[in-house]
Amino acid sequence: MYRLLSVASVPLLASLVHGYADPGACSGVCTTHDPGLIRRESDGTYFLFSTGNKISYVSASSIEGPWTSVGSMLPDGSSIDLDGNDDLWAPDVSYVDGLYYVYYAVSTFGSQDSAIGLATSETMEYGSWTDHGSTGIASSSAKIYNAIDPNLIYADGTYYINFGSFWDDIYQVPMKSTPTAAASSSYNLAYDPSGTHAEEGSYMFQYGDYYYLFYSAGICCGYDTSMPASGEEYHIKVCRSTSPTGDFVDSDGTACTDGGGTMVLESHGEVYGPGGQGVYDDPNLGPVLYYHYMNTTIGYADSDAQFGWNTIDFSSGWPVV
């Protein structure tokens, strides 16, 4: 039988999980949700994009900060004609042929009426962004997936977008050679057949011979009003494959399309509900897992979510933080 836990009990339960390093240092504006991280090619400035405020973003000279506000990426919202086009989600940022690409999601909470859009800029400075609208990756109640939480990867000469949330979970679609639009139909990469199929926020990263499919599992939000049962809050899992397009398995060999997934990071110490993750190959630190989390000493509202990051050790063949 499931029961809701009081907020006061969460730090005690989280402290029972051991073995994870604390998040790296962060100063300045450290509130974020579904972060997207990149370092500008021209001068090494870091930019961090976030769900909310029509994609809010901050910048800093170091991953540790101090982070200062830049503003909204698309202050007029998205040109995509869907509810939620003024409340954009889950930015994913990449550098493509001299332009910074930020993919974003347009949707409303719990809806499949969703689409993935794109904005580009040469500099990432405030006011420099061009909204290209929809990439053609979209969903409705007639689909078996939800077209949110985009992530771009370039592999073997092809761009792919990974996306999806609940329903049939994580999908992938090949993109055109200039990745502004989908090139063909999508296919499934990961699926949890149990419960509410609570997987989303995928991020693919190549290291060595493997492609690692990170994703967030569990309940993301609203902890201040409805605390999940212990272990059902957000946490980060991974599967891997030698191909970017399928056959992902966890460390036990269970297929990611059949509920497989190896734990990467979960609640511990003052960290609660880590997720919305990405991986950045930092020139000084090496691979870094970045994410949002609730600091139990600050609060559990969505607006309290903090920027977290840890270096990744791949020496075992699996990511360890």
From Swiss-Prot:
Record localization: Secreted
The job of this chain, per UniProt, is described as: Endo-1,5-alpha-L-arabinanase involved in degradation of pectin. Its preferred substrate is linear 1,5-alpha-L-arabinan.
Q: Which UniProt keywords apply?
A: Carbohydrate metabolism, Glycoprotein, Glycosidase, Hydrolase, Polysaccharide degradation, Secreted, Signal, Xylan degradation
Listed name of the protein: Probable arabinan endo-1,5-alpha-L-arabinosidase A
One biological process term from GO is: hemicellulose catabolic process
- Annotated organism of origin: Aspergillus niger (strain ATCC MYA-4892 / CBS 513.88 / FGSC A1513)
UniProt pathway: Glycan metabolism; L-arabinan degradation
Q: EC class of this enzyme?
A: hydrolase
List the Pfam families.
Glyco_hydro_43 (PF04616)
Q: Name the cystine pairs.
A: none
